[in-house]
Amino acid sequence: MSQRPNTPQRDRPTEYRLSLSSNASSRRSSLGNNGRDQHASNQTMIEKYVLPQLQELSDSMVTLDGNMTHMNFIHESIADLNEALSALLYGLMCNSWCVDFPNISHDTPHELKLIQRLEELKQERQALQAKLKPKELTKGSILPLSRQPLSRGSQMLYRDENVPGSTASSNVNIDINDDEDNTAASFVSNPTTFKPQMISSVGASTDFMGKQTVGSASSKLRRRSILHQIRNNAAIGTIPNTLTGITPGERKRSLAVSAKRIPILAGSSTTAGSASSANRESTNTEPALPNRVVRTRQRTYNPKNLASRPPFR
C-alpha cells in the first residue's frame, strides 16, 4: 500500500494571501477578523498605522493603472501622428527633389559671384565698343585727297587734283538748288549742243569701301531739265573744272539773263565768211567721176552778214 508524500505542515488551517485582483475592503476585513482572533493586542497598531498605508497604496495603484491607460492612448495617437507626419515630410522631400524651383537659390554666394562677374563682363564689353567706335569712324572718314567730297548745295562733288589733264578752278560757286528757290528767271532758254557731265573724272573709280562705282555719282544726280543745266553752267561767268573742255561756240546764251549787246569781233566776219565760203565750196562741188558732168548747185537764198542782224536777241 503506497503512502502519500509528506506535505509541509501549516501553522494555521487557513492562510490568506494577498492578490493583486482582490478587493481592498475584503482584505481589510479578513485581516481585521484574523487579527482579532490571533493578535488582539496588536489590533490597535495595525488599524492605526498599517491599514491607512495599504489603503493609500491601493489608491495609488488604481491611479497608476488609469494613468498608464491614458499614456497608452497618447502613445498610440503619437504613433499614428508620426506615421502621417513622416509620410507628409517624405512626400515634400520627394517633391523638392523632383521639382526645380527657379526662385529658390540653393547657393546664394555662388549666385552673387556669377551676377557680379556678368556685370563686369558687360562693362568691359561696353568699354571695348566705345574704344573701337572712334577708330571705325576715322577709317570711314579719311579719304584720299582726290576723293574728298566738296559740298555744293545738296550734291557731293569730288576733287580732281590728282587726275591728269584737269585744272582746278577757284571761286566756283554752283548753287544747284537755285532752280527751286529762284522764280525771277525766265523759263524759256535755248538748249545746249552738249550733254554736261557734272562728274567725269570719277566715273570709273573705286570708293573708300572697295566697291566699284562706274558712273554711280553721275547716275545718282537728279535728272534736270535743259533750262536748269544751262542756267547752272552757261549763265555763270566762271566755268567749272569739269566743263573746261567746252568751247564758247558750243555754249549758247540763256534768255534767263537780261538782254546784252553782242559785241562784233573784228575777226568774226572774216572767219564767218571764210567758213561759209569753204562750206559752199565743199557742198557745191562734188568729186569728179568718169563719165559724169560736174554741176554746181545754186542756192535760192542769199546769206546775211552778221552786221545785218539786230543788236539784241
From Swiss-Prot:
Low complexity biased stretches: 17-35, 268-278
Keywords for this protein: Cell cycle, Cell division, Centromere, Chromosome, Chromosome partition, Coiled coil, Cytoplasm, Cytoskeleton, Kinetochore, Microtubule, Mitosis, Nucleus
Chief location category: nucleus
Subcellular location: Nucleus; Cytoplasm, Cytoskeleton, Spindle; Chromosome, Centromere, Kinetochore
GO terms for biological process, alphabetical: attachment of spindle microtubules to kinetochore; cell division; mitotic sister chromatid biorientation; protein transport along microtubule to mitotic spindle pole body
Residue stretches in coiled coil: 110-139
InterPro entries, alphabetized: DASH_Dam1 (IPR013962)
Domain of life of the source: Eukaryota
Region Disordered, residue ranges: 1-39, 268-313
Presence of the UniProt keyword Coiled coil in the record: yes
Pfam families (UniProt xref): DASH_Dam1
GO cellular component, as recorded: cytoplasm; DASH complex; mitotic spindle polar microtubule; mitotic spindle pole body
Annotated function: Component of the DASH complex that connects microtubules with kinetochores and couples microtubule depolymerisation to chromosome movement; it is involved in retrieving kinetochores to the spindle poles before their re-orientation on the spindle in early mitosis and allows microtubule depolymerization to pull chromosomes apart and resist detachment during anaphase.
Quaternary structure and interacting proteins, as annotated: Component of the DASH complex consisting of ASK1, DAD1, DAD2, DAD3, DAD4, DAM1, DUO1, HSK3, SPC19 and SPC34, with a stoichiometry of one copy of each subunit per complex. Multiple DASH complexes oligomerize to form a ring that encircles spindle microtubules and organizes the rod-like NDC80 complexes of the outer kinetochore. DASH complex oligomerization strengthens microtubule attachments. Within the complex, DAM1 and DUO1 may form the microtubule connections. On cytoplasmic microtubules, DASH complexes appear to form patches instead of rings.
Family of the protein in this entry: Belongs to the DASH complex DAM1 family.
Protein name: DASH complex subunit DAM1
Lineage of source species: Eukaryota, Fungi, Dikarya, Ascomycota, Saccharomycotina
Gene: DAM1
